[in-house]
């Protein structure tokens, strides 16, 4: 009964409502700007000697806080999306399905920006840090933000977008989209690759060359984010099917 009521009430909502996306983007960007300012201030003041008490205060405290918080957030988001899933997807109207497809696109936009911050901005920044500072720990200020904050954050958003599609959209609920699996799991696999990377730098290859074979895993898994184009093609195909020939003709 609740599912039917939810579906019926959703029909009255707007098909295109971008407020969620703008709120998500604003929150993400403001958060990372604050993080970047924090890095600039305390990276030099308290981030050069891992044995100093201030390093424990300003940096390791972040590490021990962010890891369990991100894990709980990812599991909680997936659990909530599954618990509140639409159990009668066959009753979803074309208009409501279109609204949900638009919402999925918004998830993907926020995911793309999160990947930019993690896999581009903070990753390139880490290269600058290595060229400037001789590190005495694997948990440098740059790594604490890059590996253990920005990567898990975009992974949590990937989990959200994947579970949203699987639990709300009939097309993606029919099976597993290979493109969606690639775009969601590929960049996430950079995180276990971090372990290989740090082990390699400790016992094998200490030079921080970005073109070194030890770093190829970052590129391989990072480029899997391009699977988003496959997901977009699937979304557009479904939009075309919902609109029909007459509706599609109006857009050309």
What are these regions (language model features)?
Residues 1, 66-82, 148-161, 218-238:
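Hydrophobic cores of alpha-helical transmembrane segments in multi-pass inner/ER membrane proteins
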Residues 26-44:
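Alpha-helical transmembrane segments of multi-pass membrane proteins
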Residues 54-66, 135-149, 210-219:
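Short aromatic-rich membrane-water interface segments that cap or initiate transmembrane helices
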Residues 177-252:
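C-terminal transmembrane-bundle signature of multipass membrane proteins
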